[in-house]
């Protein structure tokens, strides 16, 4: 469902898929080849939310902002199931693991993997190519080439999968 709010209207490239029970509110931009899965909520009622080309937001995730804290998801990013993103920036080609929480003004670099249930605190900067686990999240090493390829394959799966869903769910 798409909802306008206070003259803020979601912008949809039209070349993507939004599950019938996902909720997109206000100042949200969906670039092409994105997918927003079941029960996800993207609430752009305070600041802008941008979902970059080729990215996916999986089931039950919540994306929100605060004043002065817009939310940007880069290109080809996987936001796993039940993730909470709040007023943060996610770099291109990154994977945010199941149940992770990333808070205001945190900045996740490109090609990062944020492990399941990780907590990235406010204002935390995660360098490019980092593998982060724990609560609070800590960089434990660089992402390997094999892991980078696996992230790409996961993202590609969701880019292909939404096209199947768009033809079978009405």
Tell me what each language-model feature is.
Residues 128-129, 146-148:
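Short, glycine/charged-enriched secondary-structure capping and boundary segments
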Residues 5-6, 10-132, 137-139:
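Structural signal for interior beta-strand "rungs" in well-ordered beta-sheet cores
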Residues 157-170:
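Charged phosphate-binding loop/patch that engages nucleotide di/tri-phosphates or the phosphate backbone
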């Amino acid at each position: 469902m798409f909802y306008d709010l206070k003259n803020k209207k979601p912008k949809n490239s039209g070349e993507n898929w939004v599950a019938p029970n996902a909720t997109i509110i206000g100042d949200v931009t969906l670039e092409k080849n994105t997918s927003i899965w079941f029960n996800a909520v993207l609430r752009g009622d305070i600041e802008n939310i941008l979902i970059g080309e080729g990215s996916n937001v999986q089931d039950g995730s919540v994306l929100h902002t605060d004043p002065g804290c817009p939310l940007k998801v880069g290109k080809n990013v996987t936001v796993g199931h039940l993730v909470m993103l709040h007023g943060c920036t996610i770099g291109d080609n990154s994977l945010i693991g199941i149940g992770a929480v990333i808070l205001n003004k945190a900045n996740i670099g490109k090609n990062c993997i944020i492990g399941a249930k990780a907590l990235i605190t406010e204002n935390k900067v995660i360098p490019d190519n980092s593998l982060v686990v724990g609560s609070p999240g800590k960089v434990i090493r660089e992402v390997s080439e094999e892991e980078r390829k696996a992230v790409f394959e996961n993202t590609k799966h969701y880019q292909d999968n939404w096209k199947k869903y768009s033809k079978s769910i009405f």
